[in-house]
């Protein structure tokens, strides 16, 4: 039994049939970190470690219905938003988020502005980027773009960590949200992420690069971990630090599955089975 209320995280994202990213990665991450995961699915994808092969969008009205069903019964302490697809989906989600945050102003909203799958398939229509900027991003507390996504959102090129700092500050000013700009696309032995919080304080997080092709779902996992830590009361800079560590360990313990970009291992914080669960069953006469 839980001794205190469990943090509730609603993930609004696409379903990954391979289980490495999207809703599946979100559920694994949130559960591993001790929170409760609920979902609103925006699209079904036919994918594996070799790439995304097909996408079936969920009708916007049905996405809204999923969100309302969760919020009106289970509730949420944080909402993580991932794959969106098209403008009508963005507008539908934004409409629901406005209603939810008006009733619950302390709700954390973390948006991972997913645009491309690792294989290069578009997960957000180019013509929808303007809608994303105008309708949804201003509703976020934290936005977690990688470098290509930040370039699309800002219209500027990023080639250095100094560029990252400038663009993160620019995106903060244009959205009002804290920006965690992920630097994994820059070359080098170190990976640097930049955080600009809502007080315009700048933080730099650096760690040695892990040489691995088992990195499918890192963005989804990071955003879900961040949303979970925030819902659990961790302050933003510390939540970023903890979320980055969780993703790093999930990469290091990747199960080596698939012939392409393999999934992470999310079950890091699950304790080993209790002794009575590993004993053989009692044989009854």
Features from the language model and the residues they span:
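Nucleotide and nucleotide-moiety/phosphate-recognizing core
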Residues: 88-102, 106, 177, 198-202, ...
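Conserved N-terminal subdomain of the carbohydrate kinase-like
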Residues: 2-11, 31-111, 115-118
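Phosphate-handling active-site elements
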Residues: 34-38, 201-203, 229-243
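Conserved phosphate/ATP/ADP-binding segment of small-molecule kinases
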Residues: 126-202
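Short, small-residue alpha-helix embedded
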Residues: 151-152, 212-236
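N-terminal basic/disordered segments at the start of proteins
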Residues: 19-35
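Charged C-terminal helix
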Residues: 6, 57, 237-285
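Short pre-catalytic strand/loop immediately N-terminal to key active-site residues, enriched for Gly-Thr
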Residues: 12-18, 202-216
